[in-house]
Amino acid sequence: MIADKDHKLFLNSISDTIDLFIAYTVKDSVARRIVKYVYNYEAQSTSTIPLHLSNKELAKELNVSEATIKSSLSRAKSSRLITVIGLGACRLISLNTKTICEIRDSLFSL
């Protein structure tokens, strides 16, 4: 649940390093922007519902084409930083905090 207090505390605790985690994991620039958009949504939202945007809406938000969104969303999903449930306008997109914790632990254990 996005509005969960512990989730918000976690998101605030990684605010200084989220760009590093994204850059380390996601190679495609638009895919990085998608993950960062989802992070910002969850960090600022008071909603209990994950982000739900169609390809067209997400393309408009990020100022890219729908075709670019399709391929970049696939790359963002393969990074495991976001979880996507459903298709099209019914799609829900949320951060995968378990993967972010694994990345944080591996980066800071070096």
Spans of features found by a protein language model:
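A generic structural micro-environment signature
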Residues: 16-20, 59, 68, 101
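Short, amphipathic alpha-helical interaction segments positioned at domain boundaries
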Residues: 100-110
